[in-house]
């Protein structure tokens, strides 16, 4: 490793990145299995805190409805809907961390361009399963 102790980074990461990162640090081959490994090794960021390996992070959170979110350095888009429910019934939250780091003002209705871009990124992730 070449990053100085105490270094910080602005690189977004997710808990699914831990496994591929540890595997690479241990010198093991890239993890493979019957289910896809969604994480990305963060070793490049450990070596150079300025390195970038992705431009967003994805997470999902159940709270009555399923909240699926895309987080970029600037924005967080959250989509709330029940599994199997059509997208037209979804509720959205959009926050701009440059001016509202505490997520107090939902900008979803005010930023259609940002919404369109982040919704397209969100659509690249598997839709939640529907309950029969």
Residue ranges, per PLM feature:
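C-terminal cap/loop subdomain of S1 sulfatases and analogous C-terminal strand-loop tails that border
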Residues: 3-4, 11, 16-19, 23-97, ...
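Hydrophobic packing residues in well-ordered alpha-helices of helical domains and bundles
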Residues: 70, 115-118
